[in-house]
Amino acid sequence: MDLEAKVKKMGLGHEQGFGAPCLKCKEKCEGFELHFWRKICRNCKCGQEEHDVLLSNEEDRKVGKLFEDTKYTTLIAKLKSDGIPMYKRNVMILTNPVAAKKNVSINTVTYEWAPPVQNQALARQYMQMLPKEKQPVAGSEGAQYRKKQLAKQLPAHDQDPSKCHELSPKEVKEMEQFVKKYKNEALGVGDVKLPRDMNTQGPNKMYIPGGDRSTTTAVGAMEDKSAEHKRTQYSCYCCKLSMKEGDPAIYAERAGYDKLWHPACFVCSTCHELLVDMIYFWKNGKLYCGRHYCDSEKPRCAGCDELIFSNEYTQAENQNWHLKHFCCFDCDNILAGEIYVMVNDKPVCKPCYVKNHAEVCQGCHNAIDPEVQRVTYNNFSWHASTECFLCSCCSKCLIGQKFMPVEGMVFCSVECKKMMS
């Protein structure tokens, strides 16, 4: 790709969703404007998924690329125009007759995603077993939840080098090898079935859930098992509770069909969120979302949110950073060798801290320098000096003394408090 095409592509990426309102900050945000290398809005610091941006096509491309060159190609289709793989997301529309006084109206419910099973009743049953606030009904809280989890769990920059910021040719090659490896060894999609339907494993054979994976027995030998025994032999791999007969379960092929999960228990072992669209990564007996699987394999830059493929990076405040991305969260100035303050787990340079985040002294009404001692009570702060931490009535210095706080004032005695009341 030549330089002009690269610049054009980057420009289009930054134009996507430009000006969209923030659903979290409301009117405090002037509208979405993508930061040059951080994956956040320059105005409010929230992610794109927190803004009212239509991303369905972009997300379908992202998931389509994830499934490319895997056994899950049946879940994608390539556009004739550009050959880009698109996720064939299964949308489920349910129509329920609603009786009115004079006639019958039709109530339609659209799920933006549903398990790709032929039995719609099974898919509907699966949805009903999810928390209502996480059911992806179009226009609902659940649809917004799914949108956020697609962005959080499956970052495009964890699989596509073109979505990353200034990778070297060596880093691009390493990333491509990493993606190929996790597609071959960890990536999977959950399968929704009734546990009893998973018994058949080959002609005249029945699989025993919970036993050795190679254990089989003749069908005839199982026919005398009681219904009660069949119910108790199935338990959720996550919560360990028994599965109710007739309820759908989720299987993960990479985990083996001796393990199954309740729909609401099919979650990432790190963030404990529902695995979006049942897309999972399996490692050492645990389910992960894409983000946290990658975090278990590679360091992630706390500045740009990308995986680090360089041998040289810095560690600070229990986080990892590209050398060029250990910058002030407010002004983007590089912090190497500079004084900084952590604000909400983000490093901020001293000038920006004093300007934007510092507490204001109730005595002199100036910002309190981060390196200066202070006195704090509730939400009020003072310089710990003889000029600032004084009785609000008689100006007696209160450092090391007992005091009586009243909102933003402090008093040395009851008498002084009464005189000011």
UniProtKB/Swiss-Prot annotation:
Residues 92-199 form the PET domain. One of its GO terms (molecular function) is zinc ion binding. One of its GO terms (biological process) is negative regulation of cell population proliferation. Keywords: Cell junction, Cytoplasm, LIM domain, Metal-binding, Repeat, Zinc. CDD domains: LIM1_Testin, LIM2_Testin, LIM3_Testin, PET_testin. It is found in: Cytoplasm; Cell junction, Focal adhesion. Residues 234-297, 299-359, 362-421 form the LIM zinc-binding domain. Residues 133-164, 193-213 are annotated as: Disordered. The N-terminal and the C-terminal halves of the protein can associate with each other, thereby hindering interactions with ZYX. This is Testin. It comes from Bos taurus. The gene is TES.
